[in-house]
């Protein structure tokens, strides 16, 4: 690994440090180089490059908003012996505690960033001879992302769609249900999904949804803080409904009331929020079912039963 990093990063010295870590999907280790300390994530799977390229694109997109801190990605490389590695900036992080409210506010800023870009473009359209100079980020009017991103190790279909309800049903829930059908042929799950599809449009009546750049997998294990404030990492980004972000945040804990107060101070709950939150949690329960097995079947079916009532 040291030789690979020396060659690919153009470093003269690379040395492994004592810092290592890992999650459910990949392992990581820090290295000291003459250009600074880097963190290297390693995954041996054949499809790891696609996963890491999606993560790199996600981190890059979040960085450009200048809203919430993420590690700066450096390069995706083929790993010696198979799989891939993602090299990124090393950050000294600790458990999120004193900066929860700041994270709530900054996450709302991330979700509002594209909306503000759109408002700015509209204003500029009526202004003659405005000064250029800085690179312009375009307003994103559709739902999706330029590359495949992975929530866990399963790829997400990010093809661009005009309509959020169509995007969410076809490109988030349907692929998960297809996997459930292929693996277990669970008839009850499939029948509930057929019934739920007819109900979904009712949950979005009279709701205007402007595409928001999402982290995409914001549970307590993917947030931390350093001396300057909150940090988020391991994203699976796409442009979607801001409410989607809060689904997995509420499933496994790790976020205090101050986080939610700060967030909703900037993005208030719209009518029907609680039911839509269940619909968004359904994706994550199905995704866990497909990753880790039928221990998540009961939660998946309960949500569908509640929503088809």
UniProtKB/Swiss-Prot annotation:
Pfam families: Fructosamin_kin. Keywords: ATP-binding, Kinase, Nucleotide-binding, Phosphoprotein, Transferase. Widely expressed; except in skeletal muscle where it is expressed at very low level. Expressed in erythrocytes. GO terms for biological process: post-translational protein modification. It is an enzyme of class 2 (transferase). The keyword Cytoplasm does not apply. GO terms for molecular function: ATP binding; kinase activity; protein-ribulosamine 3-kinase activity. Its EC number is 2.7.1.172, 2.7.1.-. Signal peptide: none annotated. The keyword Phosphoprotein applies. The modification Phosphoserine is found at residue 20. ATP binds at residues 89-91. It catalyses: N(6)-D-ribulosyl-L-lysyl-[protein] + ATP = N(6)-(3-O-phospho-D-ribulosyl)-L-lysyl-[protein] + ADP + H(+); N(6)-(D-psicosyl)-L-lysyl-[protein] + ATP = N(6)-(3-O-phospho-D-psicosyl)-L-lysyl-[protein] + ADP + H(+). GO terms for cellular component: cytosol. The active site is at 217 (proton acceptor). InterPro entries: Fructo-/Ketosamine-3-kinase, Kinase-like_dom_sf. The ATP-binding domain is structurally related to aminoglycoside phosphotransferase family. Ketosamine-3-kinase involved in protein deglycation by mediating phosphorylation of ribuloselysine and psicoselysine on glycated proteins, to generate ribuloselysine-3 phosphate and psicoselysine-3 phosphate, respectively. Ribuloselysine-3 phosphate and psicoselysine-3 phosphate adducts are unstable and decompose under physiological conditions. Not able to phosphorylate fructoselysine. Belongs to the fructosamine kinase family. This is Ketosamine-3-kinase.
